[in-house]
Amino acid sequence: MSRICQITGKKRMIGNNRSHALNATKRKFLINIQYHRFWIADEKRFIKLRVSTNGMRYIDKKGIETVIRKINMKK
């Protein structure tokens, strides 16, 4: 399964490891993805999402119902 946040759409970035001699080798910068269950009070059930920690902070700020409505409007 791809490491993409279901809320923010963030995914990995590609960059370089740089040695002391400034040799460059390719590497991936992975985002901090977590499985998290959120309680939806209106429906009286849990929903399980793969979200980045930044996405969790966004949900804490806006509320899960608002975020879910916003995602469904995009689709």
From Swiss-Prot:
It comes from the Bacteria. InterPro entries: Ribosomal_bL28, Ribosomal_bL28/bL31-like_sf, Ribosomal_bL28_bact-type, Ribosomal_bL28_sf. Pfam families: Ribosomal_L28 (PF00830). One of its GO terms (biological process) is translation. Transmembrane segments: none annotated. One of its GO terms (molecular function) is structural constituent of ribosome. Coiled coil: none annotated. Keywords: Ribonucleoprotein, Ribosomal protein. GO terms for cellular component: cytosolic large ribosomal subunit. Belongs to the bacterial ribosomal protein bL28 family. HAMAP family: Ribosomal_bL28 (MF_00373). NCBIfam families: L28. This is Large ribosomal subunit protein bL28. The gene is rpmB.
